[in-house]
Amino acid sequence: MIKDIKLKFGRAEGLAPESIEAMPITVFVGPNNSGKSKILTEIQQFCASGSRNANNLLIESIGLSPVAEEILDKKIQGVTLKPNPGEALHPGHIFVGKGPTRHQVSQTAFKQALKTPNAQQTHTCQWYLAYNTLILNGNNRINLVNQQAAGNLQNPAHMSFQVLFRDDAKRKEVRRIIHEAFGQHLVIDPTNLGQLNLRLSKEPPQDDMQERGIHAEAVEFHANAMPITQASDGVKAFTGMVTEMIAGDPSVLLMDEPEAFLHPSLSFKLGKEVSGIMSASDKRLFVATHSPNFVMGCIQSGAPVNIVRLTYRNEVATARVLPNEDILKLMRNPLLRSTGVLSGLFYEFVIVTESDADRAFYQ
C-alpha cells in the first residue's frame, strides 16, 4: 500500500532530498541517534491519520499505491465489521475497524479511497491502513505472549491468540517456525476457562482436539507442557513477534530493533521468516536494526530488500539508499557475502584491511 517515502534531506548537505521506493522489505540502518526509530514513528503516525505532520523531522511525504480491482472486495471484507445489536446502519454504509474501534463509512467512498488513495489520504489511512498497521518495539514485544482473553467464539476474533486458536493453518505455521527455532512445539492452552495461554511442548498434539479441547486428555497434555512465561526473554520476544505477524496479517509492519534479546542465529532466523511472511506484493515491512545477522536473514529470504543508511552528524542529516539491485551484486560476490561487510553499515567509519590479522589488530 505504501509506494514511496520522500525525505526532507538527501545523500549529503545541500543535495536534493532522497526518495525511497518502498520495496516489500525496507531496512533502516546507521549509528545510534541517526533517526532509525524516529522514522518508524513518523510512518506509523501517517498510517493512523493520513495527514502530514508539520513536526516531522525526517519524512516530507508518503505516497500510496492503489488497491487492484481484483482484490478490492477482499481488502474491504478484511476490515468490515458486523453491526452490534441495536446499532443503526445507514443505507449504503458499512462498519469498518478492528476490535473495539469502528467507523461507519460509505461503501462507495471507501472503495474510491482504496482505488485512488492519494486523492484522499486521510480517508484511506483512517478507514483502512490504520487497522492494517502493526508496530513491534521494545515496549511491547516481551508482553505479546502474556495471557489473553478467549472471547466469545461466536463473535469475530480481535486478539492474536483468538485468531490462532480458531485458525488451524495459521496456528500450525507459527508452530513450524517456533519448532525450527527452538525444537519445541508451541500450543495454545484453553484449559484455564475463559483465558488462552501459550505453552511449549516437547511433543506435538496428536490432533486439533487434543490442543483445543478441555477434556481429560487435553488437560493432561497441556499440564505436561511448559508455560511460555517461564521461557527466556529471547524465546518470548521471538514467539511474540512471529505470533503477531501471522495472526494479525498486517499490510504495514514496523519493527524497531527486533534483534533485542535474540542470539545472532535467531536474529538471522527472524529476519528470514519475517521477510518471507511480508514478501507479498502489497505488503510492506520497515525495520530499524543494528543487527547484520537480521539484515542477512532478510536478504537470504529472496524478498526484494532496500537498505537505507541514516546518519546525523554535526546537525546534518543524510540518507543513502542501497537498492535491491546493488544488494544482489554484493551477495553474489564471495568476498563480500558476509555479515562482516554488512556490519560496516552501522558505523560512522570503516577500516578495510588486507587480512584477518590486520583486522584483529584494529579491533
Go through the PLM ranges and name each one.
Residues M1-S51, Q206-S343, R359-A360:
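Switch/communication elements of ASCE P-loop NTPase nucleotide-binding domains
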Residues G194-R199, A317:
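Minor-groove-contacting beta-hairpin "wing" of winged helix-turn-helix DNA-binding domains
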Residues Y347-Q363:
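Conserved helicase/translocase motor-coupling segment
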Residues M1-G194, Y362:
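P-loop NTPase switch/coupling surface
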